[in-house]
Amino acid sequence: MVSFSSLALALSTVVGVLAAPGSEKYVELAKHQLTHSQTGTKNGYYYSFWTDNRGQVSYTNGKGGQYSVNWKDCGNFVAGKGWNPASAKTVTYSGNWKPSGNSYVSVYGWTQNPLIEFYIVESFGSYNPSTGATELGTVESDGGTYKIYKTKRVDAPSIEGKKTFDQFWSVRTSHRVGGTVTTKNHFNAWAKSGLKLGTFNYMILATEGYHSSGSATMTVS
């Protein structure tokens, strides 16, 4: 996922009794709602919204670390708020996530030199992202057990364009949507398993969907 070589901002149509076209609330909501890939900073947080432009996906920046995303019959998207540059910080989050099909809630990000895409998966929908991957170990953190995996993407979209790169995973065995994620615990466990991160690029509390529908409203700090 995630190639930002050609980004565009599109304001989507918003309809509803509480946000009628021409109303102040309508105009304010439209300013923050995205339907095409974009990154930026809003209310002190970095945000990243990437979509392959298949199906219907809309992302809305809320106040502070809050965001919402709605999707219907999507291809693939990843959306969320966090930090750029990232660090081994402790992430606290809460939210309401209602997927129908394949979707994840994760602490998600990238490093460079080497180019690594990483996930700390808190919950997933109909598909376990570790399916077919070899388990490299486990890490106990924040009241749960996470299984560690490594996978490879070949000629796939990345923050550096189409590249071949590794993906590092921690997948929580007991699902949750809300709590604290001590990322340092995962990064240290990955290193002990021979998984070397590079220099941090960005890291977000992400909602991802793949050929699915759903909605999510999340807040991160």
Swiss-Prot record:
The active site is at 117 (nucleophile), 208 (proton donor). It is an enzyme of class 3 (hydrolase). It holds the Pfam family Glyco_hydro_11. It is found in: Secreted. Residues 33-221 form the GH11 domain. Keywords: Carbohydrate metabolism, Glycosidase, Hydrolase, Polysaccharide degradation, Secreted, Signal, Xylan degradation. Transmembrane segments: none annotated. InterPro entries: ConA-like_dom_sf, GH11/12, GH11_AS_1, GH11_dom, Glyco_hydro_11. GO terms for cellular component: extracellular region. Its EC number is 3.2.1.8. The keyword Secreted applies. This is Probable endo-1,4-beta-xylanase B. It comes from Aspergillus clavatus (strain ATCC 1007 / CBS 513.65 / DSM 816 / NCTC 3887 / NRRL 1 / QM 1276 / 107).
